């Protein structure tokens, strides 16, 4: 097994700004609604505070790599180098730290894979810049939201009937582990 890098010590839960959660769900929906349902992939940006808290502030779609219903593949070094270059450009533009990647798992034949696949684990282990990996699960379901399980973020979109579940994984000394995630409320009430 490859050594796991980088190991960044931080305190759970990983905090998500509401805006970033909306971006993640919107990007997952975009892939879900394409012909043949495709996974989406992108980068996460934010901050690591002085008290070792990770705050996700932005999620940015990355169109590189070969996307399919069950994965995103970066086959060659040229593609990988373009992704690294794009991460650096966005880090500079947003003036935030690159924290990791996200991708979606879409419903196929009424089922959605709700874990970190072996390919996901290998990709995460070999990405020496990312210290978290976030998965957005999306499926069409009943007209009521699912309950949140410990440490996950759950969303429901009444207009479309889509359900979302967001899980975060981190590189730890004892391997890749799921860590708790939580939304930071903005305190703003929107009245329609």
Give the label of every model feature segment.
Residues 1-100, 104-192:
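MPN/JAMM (Mov34/JAB) isopeptidase/deubiquitinase module and associated MPN-bearing subunits/adaptors
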């Amino acid at each position: 097994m490859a050594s796991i890098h980088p190991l960044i010590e931080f305190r759970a839960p990983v905090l998500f700004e509401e805006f970033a959660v909306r971006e993640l769900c919107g990007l997952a929906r975009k892939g879900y609604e394409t012909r043949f349902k495709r996974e989406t992939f992108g980068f996460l940006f934010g901050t690591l505070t002085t008290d070792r808290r990770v705050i996700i502030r932005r999620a940015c779609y990355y169109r590189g790599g070969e996307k399919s219903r069950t994965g995103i593949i970066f086959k060659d070094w040229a593609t990988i180098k373009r992704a690294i270059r794009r991460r650096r450009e966005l880090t500079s533009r947003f003036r935030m730290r690159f924290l990791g990647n996200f991708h979606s798992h879409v419903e196929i034949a009424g089922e959605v894979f709700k874990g970190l696949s072996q390919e996901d684990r290998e990709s995460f282990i070999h990405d020496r810049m990312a210290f978290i990996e976030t998965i957005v699960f999306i499926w069409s379901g009943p007209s009521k939201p699912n309950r949140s399980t410990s440490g996950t973020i759950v969303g429901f979109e009444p207009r479309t009937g889509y359900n979302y579940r967001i899980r975060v994984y981190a590189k730890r000394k004892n391997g890749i582990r799921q860590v708790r995630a939580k939304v930071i409320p903005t305190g703003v009430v929107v009245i329609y």
